[in-house]
Amino acid sequence: MASHLADVQAKPIPTNTKLFSMLALLNAYVPDSYLIMEECQQILGPPDPIYGGPPFEDRMKPFSDLLRVSGSRVDLVHPDIAMKRLADLNIRRSSVARSCIFLLCGEQAQPNTVRFVKDLLTKREMGQKGKEKFSHLIKDIIKEETFGQALRVLKNASNKFKDKHIFPQTVARLYYVGGSKPNFKKAEIWAKEAIERAQNNSYAADTLGQVYKNHLLKKVKLPYEIKGIAEKAFEAFRDVENKAQRELGRELSEWVGSGNFSDGFNNRGHFGFIQVAKIISGKYRRLHPFKQTLKSEVEDKFEFFEWYLSYSKLDKITVEPDYFWKDVATCYKAYTGEDAADSTSFPALVDCLNHGLFVSKERRAKFSVTEKTQSDLEQIRDELKTDYENNVDDVQVAERYVLSNIILSNKVPDSPQQPLVIELQQILQRFLSTGVHESDPEFYLLVLLLFWPEENPRTGEENDNEELNTPETEEDQLRDQPSEEVSINKDDPGENPEQPPLGLISDPDLEHCVTLMEKTYDNVYGKYLRGRYLLPLFFLGKGRGLSRWIHRSRLDAVVQRHVETESDNDPSEPNPNKTKRKKINHMWKSGDVWELPEIQNMLQPIQIETTQQREEAKVTVDCVGGKNITSRIDDKPIKSPVRFYLGFNIRGPVVFYVGAPLNASE
């Protein structure tokens, strides 16, 4: 073997060495990659074994022992030693990469092989600050060889695959962030080439915006230059946003013949706009020519990210990079003068109890935002009540007032609530009767929380609101009469318009509300949140009235205390924050969170039914009073479930399957 390696350095590379080097490079950088035997024989050249040539294993000596042949597939026995073998061969990675491009990706190339080569050159892994700038191979070529060699490989690939936008995109990125001296002019040319190849693709369009953004950030200083590049950047990111709006989820590909499809909504147009607005606000210290013209758009983007981050995250344990919310909130304050933490929009109220938690987006952004106190929440509630009383026909104002009471109840769970529950039910019933709520999933979330069946504490039966219909005053007696005998003067200031006659409206059909909530979710948020994990916002607890609804933050606080207690026993930990986040994520992913006694004492187990007729992702929740309500399910546990908990996300009710605890090996 050693003598053969010495020969490699002095002579042209033999075909078997060339083939082995390509297998080694692919296996080292692209897990589970392989080549088809037919491809291998083409690289080795004649004579083929079927025409009397020597067996494949003989032709591949001295590498045969390192190869594995399984059917028609060929790969390495030990991919982990592939890089060492490449180093032993003393063949540059860039040279092998070009061989992969030209020898494996001809006109009759195998589709999987083309995919492996594409991943080799362009697939970026997720790092702590978001996606890496380049694939692992390209980073290694820049580090171990030169920037020029990496550029040459990517240009070769771009010229070879003229129908794929990803390669000119990557060349553009290399020009503006890969070298010691960015070349924004060439980056712009290659970014426009990417757009030309995929004119309706939002991800291809994003690269041009990134070129302008980085140009602003790193090089532009003079006011006229700032203005010119900023205008180009805003135009580019608006183009990204428009194209993202027209892209469809992949699940629709079989129904729609043609179009652009993506696994998730591309938020880079929104976020790129925010970043550019933030950059120029820092460059214009005094006279900011864009401030007033951009304010409305910045507010719109801020509202988008408020609900986007309050209702969802990338997956069950992955959130946006720490800088994400920092850039959004900082830009919002620069253009409006308002703190993001003071917002009282519906998603901001949903999220406000997270303030101060280790896992909150505010803490990750390193903002000094503290936990909301009871006094803070009471003040918010009172302000929203006044706002509602002055705008009784505004359903969104009503929603915020109702929600503020549920949020406050999580701080003061033992306060008297029955009269308050009745008041809030009346508000929702009034809008149910008018139909003005029909485009709003938040409204149905509140209806489900306020009217979810519960037992009457005196009888143990379902609380059917009998006490609401027991007349105690002259006004109550009037309300209990049939509708044709009741006269309401809307112009009479003595009447209270937000409290309609309860006897005229029956409790809502919750099963129908679940259906309507899913429908409105699909209409309002479905496009934007597809492919993301919908966060549970509330869980059904053991209390009564508003106290039944446990905000997700209370579970996170318990998990945080548990992890911090464990960490106190290991003061030698070099990166405590990273370790803490990892442990918190593991508890949610593994299901250990459900085994904590504090959480078990909070949550109310439920009974469910499954039937063959129902969709696989749905079950029926058995409620008191014999009512059955359809719910989706979260991930099932590895082991058989032993109990079930009910949560709510912005799409509707969700059942959490709690399995038996896993042992260490599992």
Where in the sequence are the language-model features?
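Short coil-to-beta transition motif at edge beta-strands of beta-rich domains
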Residues: P637-R643
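Extended alpha-helical scaffold/coiled-coil
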Residues: P111-S631, P641
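Short, surface-exposed secondary-structure edge patches
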Residues: R632-K636
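C-terminal leucine-rich, beta-strand-based interaction scaffolds used for sensing/assembly
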Residues: L26-N159, I166-Q169, Y175
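Conserved GTPase G-domain substructure that encodes guanine base recognition and part of the catalytic core
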Residues: M1-L5, G45-P47, G228
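Amphipathic alpha-helical segments of the small helical/lid subdomains adjacent to P-loop NTPase cores
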Residues: M1-L19, Y51-P55
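OB-fold/S1-family single-stranded nucleic acid-binding modules
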Residues: G647-E666
